[in-house]
A protein has these predicted regions:
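A generic membrane alpha-helix/interface feature
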Residues: 22-24, 101-102, 128, 191
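Phosphate-binding/switch region of NTP-binding enzymes
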Residues: 112-198, 202-204
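Short, low-complexity, polar/charged sequence segments that are solvent-exposed and flexible
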Residues: 28-31, 66-71, 99-101, 135-136, ...
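Short amphipathic alpha-helical segments
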Residues: 21-23, 93-94, 156-157
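P-loop NTPase motor core
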Residues: 59-154
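Short, surface-exposed, polar/charged, turn-prone segments marking secondary-structure boundaries
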Residues: 10, 37-41, 77-78, 107-110, ...
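Conserved inter-motif catalytic segment of the P-loop NTP-binding fold
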Residues: 4-90
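P-loop NTPase nucleotide-binding module
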Residues: 1-6, 209
Length: 209
Protein backbone atom coordinates (compact mmCIF):
# COMPACT_ATOMS: atom_id res chain seq x y z
CA UNK A 1 0.00 0.00 0.00
CA UNK A 2 2.88 2.38 0.72
CA UNK A 3 4.09 1.87 -2.87
CA UNK A 4 0.73 2.89 -4.32
CA UNK A 5 -0.82 -0.55 -4.80
CA UNK A 6 -4.40 -1.09 -3.70
CA UNK A 7 -4.71 -3.56 -0.83
CA UNK A 8 -7.84 -5.20 0.61
CA UNK A 9 -7.53 -6.50 4.19
CA UNK A 10 -10.27 -8.70 5.66
CA UNK A 11 -9.96 -9.24 9.41
CA UNK A 12 -11.84 -11.80 11.47
CA UNK A 13 -9.48 -11.84 14.46
CA UNK A 14 -9.22 -8.19 15.51
CA UNK A 15 -11.20 -5.00 15.04
CA UNK A 16 -9.66 -2.33 12.85
CA UNK A 17 -10.61 0.63 14.99
CA UNK A 18 -11.84 0.44 18.60
CA UNK A 19 -12.83 2.80 21.40
CA UNK A 20 -9.33 2.30 22.84
CA UNK A 21 -7.25 2.98 19.71
CA UNK A 22 -4.01 2.23 21.53
CA UNK A 23 -4.77 -1.47 21.16
CA UNK A 24 -6.67 -1.72 17.87
CA UNK A 25 -5.26 -3.15 14.67
CA UNK A 26 -5.00 0.22 12.94
CA UNK A 27 -2.78 1.64 15.69
CA UNK A 28 -0.51 -1.39 15.70
CA UNK A 29 -0.07 -1.29 11.93
CA UNK A 30 0.71 2.42 12.08
CA UNK A 31 3.36 1.73 14.70
CA UNK A 32 4.97 -0.89 12.46
CA UNK A 33 4.82 1.45 9.46
CA UNK A 34 6.62 4.10 11.50
CA UNK A 35 9.32 1.60 12.51
CA UNK A 36 9.84 0.65 8.85
CA UNK A 37 9.91 4.29 7.78
CA UNK A 38 6.79 3.97 5.59
CA UNK A 39 4.33 6.77 4.85
CA UNK A 40 1.23 5.94 6.91
CA UNK A 41 -0.93 8.47 5.04
CA UNK A 42 -0.04 6.74 1.77
CA UNK A 43 -0.90 3.37 3.30
CA UNK A 44 -4.28 4.62 4.53
CA UNK A 45 -5.04 5.97 1.08
CA UNK A 46 -4.53 2.58 -0.56
CA UNK A 47 -5.71 0.20 2.18
CA UNK A 48 -9.34 -0.98 2.31
CA UNK A 49 -10.55 -2.96 5.32
CA UNK A 50 -13.41 -5.45 5.72
CA UNK A 51 -13.83 -5.59 9.51
CA UNK A 52 -15.98 -8.62 10.29
CA UNK A 53 -15.51 -8.06 14.02
CA UNK A 54 -17.06 -4.59 14.02
CA UNK A 55 -19.58 -5.57 11.31
CA UNK A 56 -20.62 -9.18 12.02
CA UNK A 57 -23.05 -9.17 9.10
CA UNK A 58 -19.96 -9.61 6.92
CA UNK A 59 -19.55 -13.10 8.40
CA UNK A 60 -22.43 -14.22 6.22
CA UNK A 61 -20.70 -15.75 3.21
CA UNK A 62 -22.94 -14.20 0.56
CA UNK A 63 -22.64 -10.74 2.13
CA UNK A 64 -18.87 -11.10 2.49
CA UNK A 65 -18.37 -12.34 -1.07
CA UNK A 66 -20.55 -9.61 -2.55
CA UNK A 67 -18.76 -6.89 -0.56
CA UNK A 68 -15.35 -8.35 -1.38
CA UNK A 69 -16.08 -8.39 -5.11
CA UNK A 70 -17.53 -4.88 -5.03
CA UNK A 71 -14.48 -3.38 -3.32
CA UNK A 72 -12.03 -5.40 -5.42
CA UNK A 73 -13.51 -4.22 -8.71
CA UNK A 74 -14.34 -0.65 -7.68
CA UNK A 75 -10.91 0.06 -6.18
CA UNK A 76 -8.92 -2.17 -8.57
CA UNK A 77 -7.41 -4.20 -5.74
CA UNK A 78 -4.03 -5.82 -6.46
CA UNK A 79 -3.35 -7.58 -3.13
CA UNK A 80 -5.84 -9.14 -0.69
CA UNK A 81 -5.10 -10.43 2.82
CA UNK A 82 -7.63 -12.70 4.54
CA UNK A 83 -6.88 -12.86 8.29
CA UNK A 84 -7.99 -15.43 8.93
CA UNK A 85 -9.81 -17.77 6.55
CA UNK A 86 -12.22 -18.73 9.35
CA UNK A 87 -14.20 -15.67 8.24
CA UNK A 88 -15.09 -17.70 5.13
CA UNK A 89 -16.45 -20.71 7.01
CA UNK A 90 -20.23 -20.83 7.01
CA UNK A 91 -20.25 -24.31 8.57
CA UNK A 92 -17.66 -26.92 9.46
CA UNK A 93 -16.32 -28.55 6.32
CA UNK A 94 -17.15 -25.63 4.03
CA UNK A 95 -13.89 -23.74 4.49
CA UNK A 96 -12.01 -25.41 1.64
CA UNK A 97 -14.76 -24.62 -0.86
CA UNK A 98 -15.00 -21.00 0.28
CA UNK A 99 -11.26 -20.49 -0.16
CA UNK A 100 -11.31 -22.21 -3.56
CA UNK A 101 -14.16 -19.99 -4.72
CA UNK A 102 -12.37 -16.85 -3.56
CA UNK A 103 -9.07 -18.05 -5.05
CA UNK A 104 -10.68 -18.57 -8.46
CA UNK A 105 -12.13 -15.06 -8.34
CA UNK A 106 -8.74 -13.60 -7.44
CA UNK A 107 -7.02 -15.47 -10.26
CA UNK A 108 -9.52 -14.24 -12.84
CA UNK A 109 -9.12 -10.63 -11.66
CA UNK A 110 -5.34 -10.69 -11.23
CA UNK A 111 -5.41 -10.31 -7.44
CA UNK A 112 -2.58 -11.77 -5.37
CA UNK A 113 -4.00 -13.12 -2.10
CA UNK A 114 -2.51 -14.13 1.24
CA UNK A 115 -4.66 -16.43 3.40
CA UNK A 116 -3.91 -16.72 7.12
CA UNK A 117 -4.97 -20.02 8.71
CA UNK A 118 -4.54 -21.91 12.01
CA UNK A 119 -3.62 -25.46 12.78
CA UNK A 120 -6.54 -27.72 13.60
CA UNK A 121 -4.88 -29.94 16.23
CA UNK A 122 -2.77 -29.57 19.37
CA UNK A 123 0.18 -31.22 17.61
CA UNK A 124 2.65 -28.59 16.42
CA UNK A 125 4.92 -28.69 13.34
CA UNK A 126 2.32 -30.71 11.45
CA UNK A 127 0.37 -30.38 8.22
CA UNK A 128 -2.95 -30.28 10.07
CA UNK A 129 -4.81 -27.06 9.37
CA UNK A 130 -8.36 -25.76 9.46
CA UNK A 131 -10.06 -26.92 6.28
CA UNK A 132 -7.74 -29.91 5.86
CA UNK A 133 -4.49 -30.42 3.95
CA UNK A 134 -6.46 -30.32 0.69
CA UNK A 135 -6.89 -26.61 1.28
CA UNK A 136 -3.14 -26.02 0.90
CA UNK A 137 -2.97 -28.01 -2.33
CA UNK A 138 -5.45 -25.65 -3.98
CA UNK A 139 -3.19 -22.62 -3.47
CA UNK A 140 0.11 -21.65 -5.09
CA UNK A 141 2.11 -21.88 -1.88
CA UNK A 142 1.86 -22.63 1.83
CA UNK A 143 4.13 -21.47 4.65
CA UNK A 144 3.81 -22.86 8.19
CA UNK A 145 4.78 -20.68 11.17
CA UNK A 146 4.48 -22.52 14.49
CA UNK A 147 5.77 -22.76 18.06
CA UNK A 148 6.37 -25.81 20.21
CA UNK A 149 8.75 -28.20 21.97
CA UNK A 150 11.41 -29.99 19.93
CA UNK A 151 10.96 -33.75 20.17
CA UNK A 152 11.80 -35.59 16.94
CA UNK A 153 15.31 -36.23 15.64
CA UNK A 154 14.70 -34.44 12.33
CA UNK A 155 13.58 -31.35 14.25
CA UNK A 156 16.82 -31.40 16.26
CA UNK A 157 18.87 -31.71 13.06
CA UNK A 158 17.04 -28.95 11.15
CA UNK A 159 17.05 -26.49 14.04
CA UNK A 160 20.36 -27.42 15.71
CA UNK A 161 18.75 -27.48 19.16
CA UNK A 162 18.39 -30.05 21.91
CA UNK A 163 15.36 -32.17 22.55
CA UNK A 164 12.93 -30.46 24.91
CA UNK A 165 13.70 -26.90 23.84
CA UNK A 166 10.85 -24.62 22.76
CA UNK A 167 11.31 -22.92 19.40
CA UNK A 168 9.36 -20.97 16.81
CA UNK A 169 9.73 -22.15 13.21
CA UNK A 170 8.88 -21.24 9.64
CA UNK A 171 8.60 -23.94 7.00
CA UNK A 172 7.55 -24.01 3.35
CA UNK A 173 5.00 -26.78 2.91
CA UNK A 174 4.42 -26.37 -0.81
CA UNK A 175 5.09 -23.90 -3.63
CA UNK A 176 4.17 -24.01 -7.32
CA UNK A 177 6.01 -20.80 -8.17
CA UNK A 178 9.64 -21.66 -7.47
CA UNK A 179 12.08 -24.14 -5.99
CA UNK A 180 12.10 -24.42 -2.19
CA UNK A 181 13.46 -26.34 0.78
CA UNK A 182 11.13 -28.16 3.16
CA UNK A 183 13.44 -27.95 6.15
CA UNK A 184 12.47 -25.90 9.18
CA UNK A 185 13.91 -22.41 9.68
CA UNK A 186 14.15 -21.06 13.21
CA UNK A 187 12.48 -17.66 13.64
CA UNK A 188 11.65 -15.32 16.48
CA UNK A 189 9.36 -12.37 17.17
CA UNK A 190 11.23 -9.16 17.89
CA UNK A 191 10.28 -6.68 20.60
CA UNK A 192 8.67 -4.46 17.97
CA UNK A 193 6.47 -7.31 16.73
CA UNK A 194 8.24 -8.45 13.55
CA UNK A 195 9.10 -12.01 12.58
CA UNK A 196 12.84 -12.46 11.99
CA UNK A 197 14.97 -15.46 11.13
CA UNK A 198 17.61 -16.39 13.69
CA UNK A 199 19.82 -18.00 11.05
CA UNK A 200 20.85 -17.24 7.46
CA UNK A 201 18.22 -18.29 4.94
CA UNK A 202 19.26 -21.18 2.65
CA UNK A 203 20.27 -20.11 -0.85
CA UNK A 204 18.36 -21.64 -3.73
CA UNK A 205 20.36 -23.04 -6.59
CA UNK A 206 20.49 -20.75 -9.61
CA UNK A 207 19.42 -22.28 -12.90
CA UNK A 208 22.20 -22.05 -15.47
CA UNK A 209 21.23 -20.75 -18.90
Amino acid sequence: ASSGRKVLYATAEDTWKSATPRFDLQSRLKQKADILGLDWNKIRENLFVLDTVAYPELRDWNTFAETYRYVAEKEKIELAIIDSVTVLEAYRGALKYRVMELARYNQVHGITALYVNQRSTEAWDSYDMAGGIGLAHNLDGTIIIDYGRVYWQDQQVDLAVNRGEFVRIARVLDCRMCNFERRRIRVDITTDGFLRTTEPLPKTEETKA
